[in-house]
């Protein structure tokens, strides 16, 4: 095949301000100095084995908490919780809000559970609480925080899953998640989506 003869006219190079091309939204809970829990809506994460890598913005309460207390819970909401997530999307748990965040509308709010209409659950071994309304809650330990030399706006946080909690309605055969029952909340270019119908599965699927 001569790739030089392929028609490329239906494509156009653009320069989007954001690269949120469709990933799972999650609510990261971390421990405040006074022992209370902070909730941070996020969408940058990926998993490999039992390790979950998080992209966490600098200047916020989440990274401050993770640097001081290396535990967290990765709470995964379903599409029905998008409004709860959005209620706290413009809040920061940090009193001294960075100028850039303040400029785009962020304000201070400590009681995020109340603001979001969500309920705390005690975790099994970590100090930050889990979120009852989220069908999946992953207690995790921070293994490493890396500040890239090429970018000063975020940290790459490597975590190890310690305990994986799932709502009984989405569990299949004891230790599997039923893909037909579980739909994550997807953050797609700053819009919220659920999943559509299944189109297929990988050869390694056990369900």
From Swiss-Prot:
GO terms for molecular function: FMN binding; oxidoreductase activity, acting on the CH-NH group of donors, NAD or NADP as acceptor. The keyword Flavoprotein applies. Its cofactor is FMN. Keywords: Flavoprotein. It comes from the Bacteria. InterPro entries: Flavin_Rdtase-like_dom, Flavoredoxin, Split_barrel_FMN-bd. PANTHER family: FLAVOREDOXIN, FLAVOREDOXIN-RELATED-RELATED. Belongs to the flavoredoxin family. This is Uncharacterized protein YdfE. It comes from Bacillus subtilis (strain 168).
């Amino acid at each position: 095949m001569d790739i030089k003869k392929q028609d490329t006219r239906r494509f156009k190079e653009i320069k989007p301000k954001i690269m949120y091309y469709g990933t799972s939204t999650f609510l990261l809970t971390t421990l405040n100095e006074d022992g209370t829990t902070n909730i941070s809506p996020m969408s940058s994460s990926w998993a490999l084995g039992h390790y979950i890598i998080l992209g966490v913005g600098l200047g916020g309460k989440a990274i401050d908490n993770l640097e001081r207390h290396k535990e967290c819970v990765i709470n995964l909401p379903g599409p029905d919780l998008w409004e709860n997530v959005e209620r706290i999307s413009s809040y920061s748990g940090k009193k001294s809000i960075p100028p850039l965040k303040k400029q785009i509308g962020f304000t201070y709010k400590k009681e995020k559970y109340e603001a979001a209409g969500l309920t705390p659950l005690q975790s099994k071994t970590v100090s930050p609480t889990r979120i009852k309304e989220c069908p999946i809650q992953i207690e995790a330990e921070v293994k490493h925080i890396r500040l890239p030399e090429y970018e000063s706006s975020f940290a790459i946080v490597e975590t190890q899953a310690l305990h994986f909690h799932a709502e009984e309605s989405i569990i299949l055969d004891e230790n599997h998640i039923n893909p037909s029952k579980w739909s994550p909340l997807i953050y797609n270019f700053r819009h919220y989506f659920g999943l559509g119908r299944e189109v297929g599965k990988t050869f390694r699927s056990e369900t």
